[in-house]
Curated annotation (Swiss-Prot):
Heme b b566 binds at H97, H196. Component of the ubiquinol-cytochrome c reductase complex (complex III or cytochrome b-c1 complex) that is part of the mitochondrial respiratory chain. The b-c1 complex mediates electron transfer from ubiquinol to cytochrome c. Contributes to the generation of a proton gradient across the mitochondrial membrane that is then used for ATP synthesis. Heme b b562 binds at H83, H182. Its cofactor is heme b. GO terms for molecular function: metal ion binding; ubiquinol-cytochrome-c reductase activity. The cytochrome bc1 complex contains 11 subunits: 3 respiratory subunits (MT-CYB, CYC1 and UQCRFS1), 2 core proteins (UQCRC1 and UQCRC2) and 6 low-molecular weight proteins (UQCRH/QCR6, UQCRB/QCR7, UQCRQ/QCR8, UQCR10/QCR9, UQCR11/QCR10 and a cleavage product of UQCRFS1). This cytochrome bc1 complex then forms a dimer. This is Cytochrome b. One of its GO terms (cellular component) is mitochondrial inner membrane. It comes from Lepus sinensis. The lineage of its organism: Eukaryota, Metazoa, Chordata, Craniata, Vertebrata. It holds the Pfam family Cytochrom_B_C.
Amino acid sequence: MTNIRKTHPLLKIVNHSLIDLPTPSNISTWWNFGSLLGLCLMIQILTGLFLAMHYTSDTATAFSSVTHICRDVNYGWLIRYLHANGASMFFICLYMHVGRGIYYGSYTYLETWNIGIILLFAVMATAFMGYVLPWGQMSFWGATVITNLLSAIPYIGTTLVEWIWGGFSVDKATLTRFFAFHFILPFIIAALVMIHLLFLHETGSNNPSGIPWDSDKIPFHPYYTIKDALGFLMLILMLMLLVLFSPDLLGDPDNYTPANPLNTPPHIKPEWYFLFAYAILRSIPNKLGGVLALVMSILILAIIPFLHMSKQRSMMFRPISQVLFWILVADLLTLTWIGGQPVEHPFITIGQVASILYFSIILILMPLVSLVENKILKW
């Protein structure tokens, strides 16, 4: 008798994507981050749902409702900190996942890669709007500064900003709509994840060598289900260590002060996972130029597949490209550090050098080095 998982219309889909899926036998731990992102999304949706049951999106009561969640709701503090630190884990996994894609040439799966970029933008938008909801000082001023960037768009900028605000400043209307968007976006993200997986399963997974090897595929279950389970365990362990021992480690103390439009904090900065982009934005003295650089710092990922000059897909056997890749990682860490520093000497110069280096590595150096490597290998 045929197994029900192979005949039932719904179970068949699960079977083809999680059980009998032919998977390369040599994929490393770097391939764990996809499933970890799925776990992060589930944690965020669940904790977010319970937070939304007690939160009020009104400027007068938003801050107190978050305080009430932490003090009066059963395990409210746990739900709140799981949600806040869960976002940090989400971005750690996201950046690792994208880094893996660049290192091993997974960007040659164009549809999967492009949906991934849309997902990255959607998650960033969701995180930004979520940061506004507690209505602390950094929430308010972060929302003011970032939405104000749109005023750099010629002709329609100012009108666009006021339209997003729902008034002439960040106020009740802004908070309410941000809450609405913050609630709906994760479900849109979940739908996009399905499309991301659909396109991935059209081609099958890439592997560290970058060489397609259909004769050496193994079933996803039990080999990779157990491997993913180990990843889940490690992620939950790290998240719990963060939540239970230092829940405010990655947050900003200013956000424990209720929003006050009359008092600007000395240093306005976003959460740590946006600091690299914020540093690139600040490194350009012109407002429109800065906004374009900010958008391009992420959108540049869409150009990467067209700059692939190497005859090999993966960087596994390309030592010069590997060095360049790790310089890029170090550069991004430098930008993250600079984004959290005040705008003064020497941080301004370091930020500008790091920003130029970031774009130079991706747009100029990586394609050139690939051509040199081809030459060395007499290809």
